[in-house]
């Protein structure tokens, strides 16, 4: 059994973003993605005046099959925690601290300096001019820079590499499209991170670990930059994510995509309801009749309005509770979208402020990291619920930093039985 939630599509910002639109459309499934071969050609490039050079997912698959990526230098421009969860084989992650974005825009930041791993840094230095350099973010499909529009991190890196004489392209459809079509060439490790833990940055709300600019930028232009930007300090989230879903309440579990496909885990915790907060991850046991599904088609991107789905998500979780079943709320890595829904549930059902609900979840799962604009939507939700919070002392900060992506962020609350 499955409930598919279909919301209004995300606003198109193809000059700065490749996020998949809401409404269930598969990320990166754009028409006309060409293919080709040859390390230095423009095979699969987008057409049209001013279009940025790209390669198709099919082209990359052929290169990996034929040469094992020997003639390629793959650069993953997504946030570190997404890279650790899953990435294309041989890829190097570019974790750009927010403060360095300004230097990158000014053109005085060597790309090599933002590669954290020494071996990867050397590999980049020796191969960037000889190999085809292919950059990818989460889901950029077709992209034409617009005069005066703010450049994405992907665009800044691509332009700098080409200015430096590199044969650089971006991957059409991004990681989402490639993983969907050629998952055999993706390395997945959603349970742990190989990077050392680091102290979370201090946020505007005082919420440790909040990704101030995961899907935005540094504080100056967080409304405009896309999901290819990194965390505010470029550091990885703590590597303490458990290899099983975390129990938030006796019936409510928070997890990742891998948890949703593990029958042993689902059976162990009595989970019969699964809330899938992604646009394209499949519901593994949908046709067996044993589980009840609801899918919220939202990407982890600044332009997405997750708050419009709060009432339905809360009702779904409560339905599981009323039937004395466990419910798993998951996204890809279990740190952003699913956390946002879980926090919203606690706020409404337990009358907790945003700070208190966030801290409640963080005590259970230390590596949570919702993107900044989802936090803005939770702040709107807090006001709608009439809850008090220390955040109320930061009214001016709300105006400066938060933007709800659509006009549908306010909604009549369902009459729900309190816990």
Curated annotation (Swiss-Prot):
UniProt-listed GO biological process terms: ERK1 and ERK2 cascade; MAPK cascade; negative regulation of ERK1 and ERK2 cascade; negative regulation of MAP kinase activity; peptidyl-tyrosine dephosphorylation; signal transduction
Active site residues of this protein: 331
GO-annotated molecular function: MAP kinase tyrosine phosphatase activity; MAP kinase tyrosine/serine/threonine phosphatase activity; protein serine/threonine phosphatase activity; protein tyrosine phosphatase activity; protein tyrosine/serine/threonine phosphatase activity; protein tyrosine/threonine phosphatase activity
Record field: compositional bias (Gly residues): 31-47
Start-end of Low complexity biased regions: 10-29
Positions in coiled-coil regions: none
Keywords noted in UniProt: Cytoplasm, Hydrolase, Protein phosphatase
Pfam families noted in UniProt: DSPc (PF00782), Rhodanese (PF00581)
Cross-referenced InterPro entries: Dual-sp_phosphatase_cat-dom, MKP, Prot-tyrosine_phosphatase-like, Rhodanese-like_dom, Rhodanese-like_dom_sf, Tyr_Pase_dom, TYR_PHOSPHATASE_DUAL_dom
GO cellular component, one term: nucleoplasm
Domain Tyrosine-protein phosphatase: 244-387
Record family assignment: Belongs to the protein-tyrosine phosphatase family. Non-receptor class dual specificity subfamily.
Protein name: Dual specificity protein phosphatase 7
Underlying gene: DUSP7
């Amino acid at each position: 059994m499955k409930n598919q939630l279909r919301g209004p599509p995300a606003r198109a910002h193809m000059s700065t973003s490749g996020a998949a639109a809401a409404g269930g459309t598969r990320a990166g499934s754009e028409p006309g993605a060409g293919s080709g071969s040859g390390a230095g050609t423009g095979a699969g490039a987008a057409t049209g005046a001013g279009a940025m050079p790209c390669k198709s997912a099919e082209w990359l698959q052929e290169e990996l099959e034929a040469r094992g990526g020997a003639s390629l230098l793959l650069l993953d421009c997504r946030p570190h925690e997404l890279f650790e969860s899953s990435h294309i084989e041989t890829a190097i992650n570019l974790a750009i601290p927010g403060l360095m974005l300004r230097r990158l825009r000014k053109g005085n930041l060597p790309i090599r300096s933002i590669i954290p791993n020494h071996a990867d840094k050397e590999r980049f230095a020796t191969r960037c001019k000889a190999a085809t350099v292919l950059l990818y973010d989460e889901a950029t499909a077709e992209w034409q820079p617009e005069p005066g529009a703010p450049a994405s991190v992907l665009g800044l890196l691509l332009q700098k590499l080409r200015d430096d004489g590199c044969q650089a392209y971006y991957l059409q459809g991004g990681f989402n499209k490639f993983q969907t079509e050629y998952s055999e060439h993706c390395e997945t490790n959603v349970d742990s991170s190989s990077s050392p833990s680091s102290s979370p940055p201090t946020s505007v709300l005082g919420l440790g670990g909040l990704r101030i600019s995961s899907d935005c930028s540094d504080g100056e232009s967080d409304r405009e930059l896309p999901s290819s930007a990194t965390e505010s300090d470029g550091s990885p989230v703590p590597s303490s994510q458990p290899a099983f879903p975390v129990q938030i309440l006796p019936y409510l579990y928070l997890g990742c995509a891998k948890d949703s496909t593990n029958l042993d885990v689902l059976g162990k915790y009595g989970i019969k309801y699964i809330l899938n907060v992604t646009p394209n991850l499949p519901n593994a046991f949908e046709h067996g009749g044993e589980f009840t599904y609801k899918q919220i088609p939202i990407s982890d991107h600044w332009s997405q309005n997750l708050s419009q789905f709060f009432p339905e998500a809360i009702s779904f979780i409560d339905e599981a509770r009323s039937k004395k079943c466990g419910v798993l709320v998951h996204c890809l890595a279990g740190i952003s979208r699913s956390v946002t829904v879980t926090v919203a549930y606690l706020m409404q059902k337990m009358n907790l402020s945003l700070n208190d609900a966030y801290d409640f979840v963080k005590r259970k799962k230390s590596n949570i990291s919702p993107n900044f604009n989802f936090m803005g939507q939770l702040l709107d939700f807090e006001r709608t619920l009439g809850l008090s919070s220390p955040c109320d002392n930061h009214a001016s900060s709300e105006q400066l930093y938060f933007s709800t992506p659509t006009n549908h962020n306010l909604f009549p609350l369902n009459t729900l039985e309190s816990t």
